[in-house]
Regions:
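Terminal hydrophobic/aromatic helix or amphipathic segment near a protein terminus
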Residues: 46, 51-103, 136-137
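Substrate-positioning beta->alpha
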Residues: 15-34, 44
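NAD(P)-dependent short-chain dehydrogenase/reductase
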Residues: 1-19
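Amphipathic terminal alpha-helices
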Residues: 108-110, 118-139
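Glycine/proline-rich active-site loop of Rossmann-fold NAD(P)-dependent oxidoreductases
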Residues: 1-2, 35-46
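Hydrophobic "lid"/C-terminal helical patch
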Residues: 32-36, 63, 124-131
Length: 139
C-alpha cells in the first residue's frame, strides 16, 4: 500500500522494472471463509493471487489513465533501484523481483471454490480509491 501511496502522490518519479502477483484482500477474505465452510479444503493450501505477475508500469498506466495525474509511468533503471535499495527499505525489497517472473498456480483454488480473482484493473483502482479515502479522513 505504501508504494501505491507514493505513486499516487507523485513521490515516486519512476517505477521499478519489476512485476509481481497481486492479491485483492476481498478475494483473500472470501477464500478464507469458503475454506472454513468447505470440507474439501481440509489440510490443503490455497493460493489467492493473480495468475500472472503485473508490471509496476502497468499499475502506473492504469492509475494515470484513470485521473491520477501525479503518477509517473517512467521506468527506473535497475542499477538505480539497486543503489537506492541501500538506503530505502521499499526499494531494497523490490530488488528480488528485478528480472524474475513468479506465476501463481491458482487452479486448485479456482476449482475447489469455483472462484475467479477480482480483475486486476479493478483491484488497482479500488486500492487507489481506498487510499484516497483514508488520506482525506486523516487530513
Amino acid at each position: 500500500m505504501g508504494m501505491f501511496k507514493q505513486m499516487m502522490s507523485g513521490k515516486m518519479p519512476m517505477v521499478p522494472q519489476a512485476a509481481i502477483n497481486m492479491s485483492d484482500v476481498r478475494d483473500i477474505a472470501k477464500i478464507h471463509v469458503l475454506a472454513l465452510e468447505n470440507e474439501k479444503a481440509n489440510g490443503k493450501r490455497f493460493i489467492v493471487t493473480t495468475e500472472e505477475p503485473f508490471a509496476f508500469q502497468e499499475v502506473a498506466k492504469i492509475l494515470k489513465s484513470n485521473g491520477y495525474d501525479k503518477v509517473s509511468t517512467r521506468l527506473a533503471p535497475n542499477f538505480l533501484l539497486n543503489f537506492i535499495g541501500n538506503f530505502d527499505r521499499e526499494a531494497k525489497s523490490m530488488r528480488s523481483f528485478i528480472g524474475k517472473t513468479y506465476n501463481g498456480d491458482v487452479s486448485l483454488t479456482m476449482k475447489t471454490f469455483d472462484w475467479n480473482p477480482i480483475p486486476f484493473k479493478k483491484t488497482v483502482l479500488d486500492t487507489a480509491k481506498s487510499i484516497e479515502s483514508y488520506l482525506n479522513k486523516v487530513d
